[in-house]
């Protein structure tokens, strides 16, 4: 019903958990988080333009590469089954999202990437409010085990890439 009402052109999922073969939703540590997870993966199965961004194998869209996830020992034991039109698999989902924003920035000739300072503040504030790092499960200023310096470095590199592309196209 929500798709009929809102009529989105595309659905994009970043680091959103999806059901595995047994219809349970698990985090990277294979904990069952079904009671705390919005079951939005269903929407992706009925829309014709979808993008999934994930890093651990348990996210919406990772069903596209389920067999490969099952073959590796460093990803989840219960991979997601949901599929998407386009999958962005990255070592950190945030970085995959930044990559998508960088590509869109170049396409429309405008830098859409968030400012590094803003991203640091968002991470720090969410941790203050109780968020935990997805890798360690601890309340620390990290994203999937990567500290703020490493996150900032990736984002700075993408800003440099986008800005150089925008300069050369003008």
Regions found by a protein language model. Give the residues of each.
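C-terminal functional extensions of proteins
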Residues: 61-170
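Conserved mixed alpha/beta catalytic, RNA-binding, or beta-rich assembly cores of soluble enzyme
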Residues: 1, 7-110
């Amino acid at each position: 019903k929500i798709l009929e009402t809102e009529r989105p052109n595309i659905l994009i999922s970043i680091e959103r958990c999806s059901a595995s073969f047994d219809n349970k939703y698990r985090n990277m540590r294979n904990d069952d988080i079904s009671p705390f997870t919005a079951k939005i993966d269903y929407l992706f199965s009925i829309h014709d333009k979808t993008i999934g961004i994930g890093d651990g194998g348990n996210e919406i869209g990772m069903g596209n590469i389920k067999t490969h996830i099952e073959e590796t020992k460093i990803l989840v034991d219960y991979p997601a089954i949901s599929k998407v039109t386009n999958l962005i698999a990255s070592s950190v989902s945030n970085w995959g999202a930044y990559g998508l924003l960088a590509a869109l920035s170049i396409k429309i000739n405008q830098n859409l990437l968030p400012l590094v300072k803003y991203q640091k503040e968002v991470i720090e504030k969410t941790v203050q409010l109780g968020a935990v790092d997805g890798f360690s499960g601890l309340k620390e200023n990290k994203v999937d085990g990567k500290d703020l310096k490493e996150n900032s470095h990736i984002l700075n590199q993408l800003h440099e890439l986008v800005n150089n592309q925008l300069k050369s196209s003008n």
